[in-house]
Amino acid sequence: MRTLDKRIAPNVKLAASLVARAPTLTLAFDARCKSRVAATLDTGEDVAVLLPRGTVLRDGDVLVADDGALVRIVAAPETVLLVRAHDPLTLMRAAYHLGNRHTPVEIGDGYLKLEADPVLADMLRRLGTQVDETQAPFQPEAGAYGGGHKHGHDATFAEDYALAQQVFGEHHGHAHPHPHDHDHQHGPGCAHGRHGHDHH
């Protein structure tokens, strides 16, 4: 069984003909977030994907097998919620509430897309958005939550947190020097957004 253990950096330009000839590996979002997964190429060949922890594959990414061959990633259609609104403010409010719940969201021109969830669908409709369940590839924003299923402790969180603290410090006169190093959950008594001390 071949192993796919390298991803070509997105800024590296490969010849289009080379990429077009590469076999494809079609994966849903959840599988594209895993650094180790047994998968089957669209040609029927079984392969093992072994990538650095925290890697999130996107549609069009190119992997290199242990024999030097290329494989192109395709985002599989999956069940998602397509969220639209009659005005930008309503869509922005929906995005805010989803972000507050650390929900992975794909942001497009006039729409939001997220994994199907009946509770979130109900919340979004109550906010005044139109919510349709559909089959489509899902590519949420990268950033502070990496693939979106983890909160706080992946490759990009430290960078994003440090930047946020720097901006906060510039506006409030001080900053915390490092990100927290513990897991936490948000519940009814959550003090999300507060640092446990008063700002004078």
Swiss-Prot record:
* GO terms for biological process, alphabetical: protein folding; protein-containing complex assembly; urea metabolic process
Entry keywords, A to Z: Chaperone, Cytoplasm, Nickel, Nickel insertion
For whether the record's keyword set contains Chaperone, the answer is: yes
The record, for SUPFAM superfamilies, names: Urease metallochaperone UreE, C-terminal domain (SSF69737), Urease metallochaperone UreE, N-terminal domain (SSF69287)
Q: Name one Pfam family in it.
A: UreE_N
Write out the ranges of the annotated region (Disordered). Answer: 171-200
**UniProt-annotated location(s):** Cytoplasm
An example GO CC term for this entry is:
cytoplasm
Under the GO molecular function aspect, what terms does this record hold?
Answer: nickel cation binding; unfolded protein binding
* Database matches in InterPro entries: UreE, UreE_C_dom, UreE_N, UreE_N_sf
Asked if the keyword Cytoplasm belongs to this entry, the reply reads: yes
Question: Which HAMAP family does this chain map to?
Answer: UreE (MF_00822)
Question: Its family?
Answer: Belongs to the UreE family.
Q: What does this protein do?
A: Involved in urease metallocenter assembly. Binds nickel. Probably functions as a nickel donor during metallocenter assembly.
Q: What is this protein called?
A: Urease accessory protein UreE
